Amino acid sequence: MSFATSTAVRPEPFVPVSVPVEDRVHAERGEFAAVLSMRHAGPSPVRLRYEWVGPANAPVVVLAGGISAHRHVASNAQFSEKGWAEELVGRGRTLDPQQLRVLAFDFIGADGALDVPIDTADQADALALVLDHLGIRALKAFVGYSYGALVGQQFAIRHRARVRQLVLASGAHRPHPYAAAWRALQRRAVELGQLQCGEDHGLALARQFAMLSYRTPEEFGERFDAAPEVINGRVRVAAEDYLDAAGAQYVARTPVTAYLRLSESIDLHRVDPAAILPPTVVVAVEGDRLVPLADLVGLVEGLGPRGSLRVLRSPYGHDAFLKETDRIDAILATAFRTSGESA
């Protein structure tokens, strides 16, 4: 073990991005029906949706994010809308689609059509079916953030011959009880909204609670330190506009069933780190309220000589992977270079 410190959900609303001619590479999006043997629900019909960008014969890297992520990671010539990892994938980045084939998929259940318990093992098996469908024997790497990191762990355990290395950010081998309690209360907010015939209101409130767990008190202190206002006889604090917007945006793109089942899926996750055999870089964020540094240290210790730890200090907490893109890119570059040297 080594240590180092470094200082789906429906797609987002369409935001076109201009792609320079010299940066245009081929991308393809598809879907197919399958029957998946699910851990808690048995054989279940599913639709698997994927998108890849890059040369068809290039090494393949899977990129998987949180439960709000989806198959469209970045704008490209075929699909010009902004992706959820727009600043991480592109020309000159480690995840350069001119050099690598970057593949992402919609998590099963993200469309709201699957109302059963979903395990991270099910997601890993779904990815294996996508690889079979595309004729991909093995991955150069699996890069996972948050929920995607959990899926990456399961994929390495259940399909160990199909991935060469892992880079896992903000996702431990088990959920922390504090974070699980946060999510349980968020699900109760949704259920309360359903009882009152206002499930969208419940989902918006759950998302607002989640934003407090994704970010840090330091960031809120810097951004929302203005004095409260009295509006129509009610006191309104500075952060409420931000939270209201976050809730409304999430409701617009997320089925309630998808949120509930994928939130549960995080809390179902349990793996033995010793069963993860590929070399693994674990990225932790000091101040992450959902995945504490100590839990990721425990994951790396369980990995033994196959694991290494990188620690980021960031005011963005759990969202650092999405906000600190230059630093994440540098970690990916080192991880890929080290893997190539040891091959």
Model-predicted regions and their roles:
Residues 298, 306-343:
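Catalytic active-site module of serine/aspartate enzymes centered on a nucleophile-bearing elbow/loop
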Residues 282-287:
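Conserved strand-to-loop "acid loop" that flanks and positions the catalytic carboxylate
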Residues 139-177:
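Conserved hydrolase catalytic core segment
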Residues 121-140:
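Conserved acidic catalytic loop of the alpha/beta-hydrolase fold
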Residues 167-196:
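Flexible "cap/lid" loop of the alpha/beta hydrolase fold
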Residues 51-110:
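N-terminal cap/lid subdomain of alpha/beta-hydrolase-fold enzymes
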Residues 289-295:
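Conserved alpha/beta-hydrolase "acid-adjacent" motif
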Residues 23, 187-278:
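Alpha/beta-hydrolase
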